C-alpha cells in the first residue's frame, strides 16, 4: 500500500527480492517498527533532512537464487525467491493532499479503479502530464513546502501471498522508481517512506508480513 505525492509523473515498478539470511532480529524479536511520519511537525517530503524512513541502503542490483544453475540463467523470473507485483493495482486519485481516501491502508479496499503497474497515472486518464527541466511547475515557490491546493496524490493497493518456504527469510520489497515521494504500509502498518523519482528504493518488510494474504 502506498500513497504518492508528486509534481511530475509517476513510474512505478515493484517486485519482491529475497536476500539470503534470517529475518532481522533484535534480542530475538523482529526489528523495530519505524514510527509513522504523523509525529513530525511537517510531512517528510517537506523536510530536507529526510530522504527516506526505514529505507535500505542503496546497492548494486542483485538477485538471490537457490541453485547455481538457476543463477546462470541470468533471469530473475527463474528464481523461486522472486515475485513480481507488476500488473493491476487498485487505485484512487486526488488532485491535492488531504482529499485522498483516509486510512485506506487499514483494510482491503473495494470499488476502486484499476491501474496497470508499471505506468504513469497521467497516461491512464488522471491529471495531466507536466514536464519542467529548469523551473518549478508551480507558484509560489516556498521551500521546503509544497503546494496544497494542487498537487496530485495517488493511493495504490494490492494483495499478495508469500510462499510458505520463504518463512524465516529476509524479504525485501523493491520499487524500481516512484515520483516523487511515497509512503508504504504493509497490512495496515507504516513500513517506510522514500523519495528520489528515478532511483530504486528497497525496504525489509519481513516484520510486517503474515501468513496468507498480505496487503500493500
Language-model segments: residues:
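Short glycine/proline-rich turn/loop motifs
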Residues: 135-145, 150
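Bacterial Sec-dependent N-terminal signal peptides
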Residues: 1-27
